[in-house]
């Protein structure tokens, strides 16, 4: 039996755990342990340029593909990165468990190569195929509501940053498309 987990939904779960700790509904060590398990899972999971699949078989740490295509989800990855970076800020106590969590979250974030998934005009691809021949008809990530956080993560990356103009280019691309339609 497979246990399918969603990358994007896991981001919401991480944030809920933090809110639960803050409001004293969830024990801090319980939340820390769960988020630690998630980061261990992500560090050993298959990815492409640091981008995760939308779904995984939790027992095997392998992607669960829809429509038999190996596709990795840029927005789902951005959502879980955001949640993990918030957790990294929240779990800031000076003890080994929290230091270890912060270090692993940094590892997950640092391995995302935003430059490798950007087009020549610095627009991020919304999906990323495992095999290049399956990476056809891939629309750029330019949705005004959902793209902003992804582009902010990409422009703030310590090693593989996109230029800060990339977000503005994505917005312009979206308006240009609307104007042409």
Segments predicted by a language model, with ranges:
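Membrane helical hairpin/interfacial module
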Residues: 2-11, 15-70
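Short, compositionally biased low-complexity segments
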Residues: 8-10, 78-81
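Short glycine/serine- and small hydrophobic-enriched flexible loop segments
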Residues: 14-22, 82-89, 151-154
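Extended ligand-binding clefts on enzyme/binding-domain cores
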Residues: 50-77, 83-85, 93-181
């Amino acid at each position: 039996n497979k246990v399918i987990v969603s990358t994007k939904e896991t981001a919401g779960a991480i944030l809920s755990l933090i809110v639960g700790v803050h409001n004293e509904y969830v024990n801090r060590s319980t939340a820390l342990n769960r988020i630690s398990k998630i980061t261990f899972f992500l560090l050993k999971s298959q990815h492409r340029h640091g981008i995760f699949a939308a779904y995984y078989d939790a027992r095997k740490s392998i992607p669960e593909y829809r429509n038999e295509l190996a596709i990795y989800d840029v927005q789902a990855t951005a959502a879980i990165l955001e949640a993990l970076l918030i957790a990294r800020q929240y779990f800031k106590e000076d003890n080994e468990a929290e230091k270890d969590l912060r270090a692993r979250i940094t590892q997950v974030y640092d391995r995302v190569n935003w430059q490798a998934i950007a087009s020549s005009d610095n627009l991020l691809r919304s999906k990323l195929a495992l095999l290049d021949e399956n990476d056809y008809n891939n629309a750029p990530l330019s949705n005004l509501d959902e793209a902003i956080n992804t582009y902010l993560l990409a422009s703030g990356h310590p090693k593989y940053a996109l230029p800060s103009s990339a977000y503005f280019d994505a917005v312009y691309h979206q308006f240009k498309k609307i104007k042409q339609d």
